[in-house]
């Protein structure tokens, strides 16, 4: 399957235009259609301004260019929901996308997507109900070979006990989720938010942060992550836009 993150329509030209994001995404989607993955996950910040209907409409229009046979799952980022993650922003997001978390199984692996902005913003009621849902999904997936998590925010960037900052989930919440990851043997989390590639781990739980598809802030060029899931392992590689392979050998 393929993960891409932070297309953030409108960021490149400070909300004046999204023509560059459209051009990049159309190239990426042509490559995705050629690869024909089992599914695609977009880990948040679909647009730069979650209140800009033109940005949202263009993102959705471009995503419809992905072949209908390829399921596409999206998750909210802080730009989609606002930093405060208000009731209004959550409601508007649900109206646009229909869901803010997901779970499904493919070939005996369980894939789970979280609304991480509600955790970051400490929206207690919403976060608590999602946490209860998450634990039930994890508990019911113990016969699967893998449990793989997706979210916009990574739980942490470098160290599991690192200080709270804009890039991670606050410590008081983070420990709860890391304990769940250990208890239910979650192997991987794929996240975004940082606009650069990074990897870290906690016990047997691996966090992979994927660069922005449109607005990189680090040394890596724009690109996508291709993930291959085997019965005994999960393997992934990042490819910049000009180096995406024409096929993937399992």
Which ranges hold each PLM region?
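Hydrophobic beta-strand anchors of alpha/beta hydrolase catalytic cores
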Residues: 1, 40, 111, 147-148
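N-terminal active-site segment of His-dependent metallophosphoesterases
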Residues: 1-56
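Active-site glycine-centered loops adjacent to acidic/histidine catalytic or metal-binding residues
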Residues: 6, 44-45, 77-78, 114, ...
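Short acidic, glycine-rich surface-loop motifs adjacent to enzyme active sites
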Residues: 42, 141-159
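Extended active-site neighborhood of metal-dependent phosphoesterases/phosphodiesterases
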Residues: 53-146, 164-167, 171-186, 199-237
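Histidine-centered catalytic micro-motifs
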Residues: 148-155, 187-197
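Acidic, His/Gly-rich catalytic cores of divalent-metal-dependent hydrolytic chemistry
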Residues: 231-250
């Amino acid at each position: 399957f393929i993960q891409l993150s932070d297309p953030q329509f409108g960021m490149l030209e400070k909300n004046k235009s999204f023509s560059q994001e459209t051009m990049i995404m159309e190239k990426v989607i042509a490559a995705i259609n050629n690869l024909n993955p089992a599914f695609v996950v977009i880990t948040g910040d679909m647009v730069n301004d979650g209140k800009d209907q033109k940005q949202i409409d263009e993102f959705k229009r471009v995503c419809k260019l992905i072949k209908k046979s390829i399921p596409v799952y999206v998750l909210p980022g802080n730009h989609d929901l606002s930093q405060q993650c208000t009731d209004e922003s959550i409601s508007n997001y649900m109206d646009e996308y229909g869901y803010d978390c997901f779970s499904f199984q493919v070939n005996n692996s369980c894939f789970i997507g979280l609304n991480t902005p509600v955790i970051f913003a400490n929206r207690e009621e919403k976060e608590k109900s999602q946490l209860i849902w998450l634990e039930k999904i994890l508990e019911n997936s113990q016969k699967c070979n893998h449990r793989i998590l997706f979210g916009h925010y990574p739980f942490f960037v470098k160290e599991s006990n690192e200080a709270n900052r804009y890039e991670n989930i606050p410590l008081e919440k983070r420990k709860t989720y890391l304990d769940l990851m250990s208890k239910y043997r979650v192997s991987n989390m794929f996240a975004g938010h940082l606009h650069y590639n990074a990897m870290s781990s906690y016990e047997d739980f691996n966090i992979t942060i994927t660069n922005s598809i449109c607005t990189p802030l680090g040394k890596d060029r724009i690109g996508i992550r291709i993930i291959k899931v085997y019965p005994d392992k999960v393997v992934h590689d990042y490819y910049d836009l000009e180096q995406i392979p024409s096929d993937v050998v399992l």
